[in-house]
Amino acid sequence: MNITKAFCLSIALLGASNMQAITNSDFVIQQDNTKINNYQTNRPEASKRLFVSQAVEQQIAHIKQLLTNVRLAWMFENCFPNTLDTTVHFDGKDDTFVYTGDIHAMWLRDSGAQVWPYVQLANKDAELKKMLAGVIKRQFKCINIDPYANAFNMNSEGGEWMSDLTDMKPELHERKWEIDSLCYPIRLAYHYWKTTGDASIFSDEWLTAIAKVLKTFKEQQRKEDPKGPYRFQRKTERALDTMTNDGWGNPVKPVGLIVSTFRPSDDATTLQFLVPSNFFAVSSLRKAAEILEKVNKKTALSKECKDLAQEVETALKKYAVYNHPKYGKIYAFEVDGFYNHVFMDDANVPSLLALPYLGCVDMDDPVYLNTRKLVLSNANPYFFQGKAGEGIGGPHIGFGYIWPMSIIMRCNTTHDNEEIRKCVKMLRDTD
């Protein structure tokens, strides 16, 4: 990782990766005209912060000393601890529930991404390490409640979506089937294990969860049943909050890919083989296979993960690649096995743009590079440009809006330092 890319990951993804090597001359963006004393903290009072980590506070102080741009330093100071300050509910033992921002529910995807930047500091702070282990254990528990659900309540209090026409339970906040909901917990657990060496998280709860992941993925390959066991309908004015065909969605041909009824934006898929999420499933299954083999000594279950990953990867190469008249070979966003394709990208991760960030493809993969050119151009119907910046949005927020997440992914999927600087400047100027 080059220094400017590490800087970008620090500021944009709240990660502070490899920042120890940075000096003030490594990354310079022109100062704005705001006086330093106008930048005041937006953090809660110390007594009202939900979780405090000395390792995180030390990292904030360290990074601020390295930054020459006052506004970026101010943004980092407010953004990096925000998850700990406002969303983490740790019981002090082995359970952590993470609110997704202002919604008092825990998304498997969001929680896995929210605490990700703190894993690198876990070995410096025992309480932080315990809190992170608690997130992972809670995620496994959630999967075992219902592997088809995307968001969970802290207890069994029910919620606003209990009337959805699907198999709702009081523990669920929402039950939208999204492949990535089962991938993010594996990714987080693997990263935690590799960073800390702590394998205690891979208990019987984990073994039950990964068995359910495999079962769910295979069900949604639709080989045995063209519909599968999952259906979803909602009474709503938003077309993308419900599914066609009485809740089953548009048909797919069973070719080895996995159906994702909803996107990571929580919007319904058009063609149900969502390509970025299938790539994410491949990388996650291989991580799970390594854990099962090295930690649990479950060689048969490990092989099952490897075999499924290989099957999905083979199907992606055959059905997800399209020879575009302008950009050459590219990855489609969605396919259905009948050789129909959707060409676009959405800001939410996993996305086509974010594939290298998630470790799904190499950043220099020629098909990815062609795809990247397409999704960062007007050939992507959800790529927008304005006076303040440019980037990818999505139907969840509508026309003319870009999500900072897409700018973040853009600067983490390039070797070009000038492109990285451009992205960081946009993030700074549009906060």
Name the predicted role of every residue range:
Residues 1-8:
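Bacterial N-terminal signal peptides that target proteins for export
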Residues 54-68, 113-126, 184-199, 279-298, ...:
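Well-ordered alpha-helical scaffold segments within catalytic/enzyme domains
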Residues 75, 126-142, 199-218, 288, ...:
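Extended, well-ordered alpha-helical scaffold segments
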Residues 104-132, 136-240:
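Aromatic-rich carbohydrate-recognition surfaces in CAZymes
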